[in-house]
Amino acid sequence: MDEVELYVYYKLARRDAKRLREIAARFPQVRLLLKDDGSSSDPPTWMEIHTGPLAETGERAMAAALEGLIAGTRHVERFRPA
């Protein structure tokens, strides 16, 4: 089975950004991005990119760790090599 890449995006209040970065640091396979659209809206949109053989396991663990912090829905999109 091909490895997947998971692209996860959600809203998270700026006041929780430090906690998000601390949680993400526990997952070496994840990249954490902040949407840069020139807006100062709160809450901003964050994106996680999970890659490698532990992408799905890491995504589930990170979702559990972030429970209660995210404002609204956590959107997960799956991609595989073409």
Predicted regions and their residues:
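Short S/T/G/P-rich N-terminal loop/turn motif that feeds into the first structured element of a domain
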Residues: M1-A61, T73-A82
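Large eukaryotic, non-enzymatic subunits of multiprotein complexes that serve as scaffolds/tethers
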Residues: A61-E67
